[in-house]
Amino acid sequence: MTASIAQQKIRIRLKAFDRRMLDLSCDKIIQTADTTSASAIGPIPLPTKRKIYCVLRSPHVDKDSREHFETRTHRRIIDIYSPSAKTIDALMKLDLPSGVDIEVKL
């Protein structure tokens, strides 16, 4: 089973609203991969998604008075080549902030 895992690639996609929290999570993942002798490539930054919301300021009339809010979703990809079972266990036990969304593909 270890031989089949060693030939695979793990792709980790990270998403967060806060860029600093995302970068800290990427650093933890890369550091964990390096300590278990797996080669990590990344973090590769993907385009930031901007979602703009337009809200009327007044509850009644005044359609001309509007306010804009936006959310920015920052994304990164990390590829881990030649992972061992030890690497996968270390990544599963890794404690990351709750504001970071993680998708793992083998």
Swiss-Prot record:
InterPro entries: Ribosomal_uS10, Ribosomal_uS10_CS, Ribosomal_uS10_dom, Ribosomal_uS10_dom_sf. Keywords: Ribonucleoprotein, Ribosomal protein. GO terms for cellular component: ribonucleoprotein complex; ribosome. The keyword Transit peptide does not apply. Gene3D superfamilies: Ribosomal protein S10 domain. One of its GO terms (molecular function) is tRNA binding. GO terms for biological process: translation. It comes from the Bacteria. Involved in the binding of tRNA to the ribosomes. Belongs to the universal ribosomal protein uS10 family. Part of the 30S ribosomal subunit. PANTHER family: 30S RIBOSOMAL PROTEIN S10 FAMILY MEMBER. This is Small ribosomal subunit protein uS10. It comes from Prochlorococcus marinus (strain MIT 9301). The lineage of its organism: Bacteria, Bacillati, Cyanobacteriota, Cyanophyceae, Synechococcales.
